C-alpha cells in the first residue's frame, strides 16, 4: 500500500517590530564631566520576502507489521527578501543627532530531503536506516547609511558595504537497531554526517570553505526490575552548529551603543552526554532520579570589547570546554483524574575551562 502527498504554496510574508528607548547620558574622564544629556532612540525593523515552497512525499507499507519505506522532498525559494533596520537618536529638542539605515537584500533557497526505512525483524526487534539532506543558501549584499549632523543628511558607508554568499549543506546517513529480551531492552544507533559550507564575502580575507565527515553514536540500555522499577543508561554524542549570523564577517549596528560582527572561523560545539536514570511507578504516581555527566567542546560564547567612543563590539568565539555533573529528581503525583502535580529539582557541579586568548 502506497500513499502519495504533495503540497505547494506561494505568497508574500514578513514581520516588523519597533522600539523606543530613553537615555540619560553622562560622560566622565578622571572624575570630570565633559558630556551630559537626555536622548531618545526610535528603532524600526522590517523583514519581508516573496516566497514559493512545495513538499512531495510518499509512504509505502510492505505489510501491517510496521515494515515501511517513507520519503519526502521540500523546496523553498525566498525572492526579493529585504531585511531593513533603522535607528535614530534625538536630543530633548527633537533634533536628530545620530542615525543609520541598514539594508540586507538577498534571495534564499532551502532544500530538505529524506528517505527512511523500517524493518521489524521480530516481534520485539527492528532495524531502521535512512538518508537525509539539508541545504540552505543566501546570496545578497549589505548596505548602511549614516547620519551626518553637519550636513543634515545621510551618507553611504562604503567601508561597510559588503556582498556575501553562504551555502550550508549536510548529507547524513543513519542506522538504528532496537530490541528487547525479557526484562532487558536496548537501542543502538550511529549517524554519519558530511558537512559542506561555503562563505564568500567582498571583504578581503574572509572567504571560507569547510568540509568534514563525522560520526555521532548513541546507545540506550534499559532493565525492568520486579514491581515496576526501571533502570536506564544512555550515551550520545551531539553537535550544535553555529548560526549564520555568528559567521557573517561584516559589522552591523543594533543601536548607537552596540555593534556586532560575525566570526567566519567559529567552530561547532560537540556534546558528550552520559545519563543513568531510575524510574518507579507507584500506582498512578511516578518518581525518577537521573545522574548525569555532560561535556561540551568548543563552547560558543558572545564576547564584548570596546570599539569606538561609547560603542561596544560583540562577536562570537569558541572559548573552551565546559562540564556539568549532577543529579535531577522529579515526581508526578496524580491528585485526581483531572489534576496532577509535577515536582522537579536538580543539583549539579558546573565547570568551565577557558582556553580563549586575546591578542
Regions found by a protein language model. Give the residues of each.
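Surface-exposed extracellular loop regions of Gram-negative outer-membrane beta-barrel proteins
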Residues: 1-4, 10-28, 38-40, 52-56, 196-198, 227-273, 293-317, ...
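Repeated loop/turn-to-beta-strand initiation elements of outer-membrane beta-barrel proteins
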Residues: 2-4, 64-69, 124-127, 183-186, ...
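Transmembrane beta-strands of outer-membrane beta-barrel pores
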Residues: 10-16, 60, 75-81, 133-137, ...
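Outer membrane beta-barrel strand-and-loop segments of large Gram-negative receptors
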Residues: 101, 110-114, 157-162, 263, ...
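Outer-membrane beta-barrel transmembrane domain signature of Gram-negative proteins
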Residues: 100-187, 222-226, 330, 357
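Residues on the lipid-exposed face of transmembrane beta-strands in outer-membrane beta-barrel proteins
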Residues: 1, 10, 54-60, 113-119, ...
Amino acid at each position: 500500500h502506497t500513499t502519495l502527498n504533495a503540497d505547494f504554496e506561494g505568497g508574500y510574508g514578513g514581520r516588523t517590530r519597533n522600539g523606543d528607548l530613553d537615555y540619560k547620558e553622562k560622560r566622565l574622564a578622571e572624575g570630570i564631566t565633559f558630556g551630559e544629556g537626555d536622548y531618545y532612540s526610535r528603532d524600526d525593523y522590517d523583514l519581508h520576502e516573496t516566497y514559493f515552497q512545495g513538499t512531495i512525499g510518499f509512504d509505502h507499507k510492505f505489510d501491517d507489521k510496521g515494515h515501511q519505506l517513507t520519503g519526502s522532498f521540500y523546496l523553498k525559494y525566498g525572492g526579493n527578501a529585504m531585511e531593513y533596520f533603522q535607528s535614530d537618536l534625538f536630543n530633548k529638542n527633537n533634533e536628530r543627532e545620530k542615525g543609520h539605515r541598514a539594508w540586507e537584500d538577498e534571495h534564499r533557497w532551502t532544500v530538505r530531503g529524506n528517505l527512511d526505512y523500517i524493518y521489524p525483524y521480530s516481534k520485539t526487534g527492528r532495524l531502521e536506516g535512512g538518508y537525509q539532506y539539508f541545504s540552505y543558501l543566501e546570496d545578497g549584499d549589505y548596505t548602511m547609511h549614516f547620519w551626518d549632523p553637519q550636513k543634515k543628511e545621510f551618507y553611504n558607508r562604503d567601508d561597510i558595504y559588503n556582498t556575501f554568499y553562504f551555502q550550508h549543506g549536510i548529507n547524513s546517513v543513519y542506522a538504528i537497531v532496537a530490541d528487547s529480551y525479557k526484562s532487558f531492552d536496548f537501542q543502538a544507533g550511529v549517524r554519519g554526517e558530511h558537512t559542506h559550507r561555503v562563505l564568500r564575502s567582498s571583504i578581503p580575507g574572509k572567504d571560507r570553505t569547510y568540509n568534514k565527515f563525522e560520526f555521532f553514536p548513541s546507545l540506550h540500555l534499559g532493565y525492568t526490575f520486579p514491581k515496576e522499577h526501571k533502570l536506564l543508561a544512555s550515551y550520545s554524542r551531539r553537535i550544535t552548529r553555529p548560526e549564520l549570523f555568528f559567521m557573517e564577517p561584516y559589522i552591523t549596528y543594533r543601536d548607537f551603543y552596540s555593534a556586532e560582527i560575525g566570526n567566519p572561523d567559529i567552530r561547532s560545539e560537540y556534546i558528550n552526554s552520559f545519563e543513568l536514570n531510575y524510574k518507579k511507578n507507584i500506582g498512578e504516581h511516578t518518581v525518577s532520579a537521573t545522574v548525569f555527566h555532560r561535556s561540551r567542546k568548543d563552547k560558543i560564547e558572545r564576547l564584548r570589547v570596546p570599539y569606538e567612543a561609547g560603542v561596544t563590539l560583540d562577536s562570537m568565539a569558541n572559548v573552551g570546554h565546559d562540564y556539568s555533573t549532577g543529579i535531577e529528581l522529579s515526581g508526578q503525583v496524580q491528585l485526581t483524574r483531572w489534576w496532577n502535580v509535577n515536582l522537579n529539582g536538580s543539583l549539579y557541579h558546573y565547570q568551565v575551562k577557558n582556553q580563549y586568548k586575546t591578542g
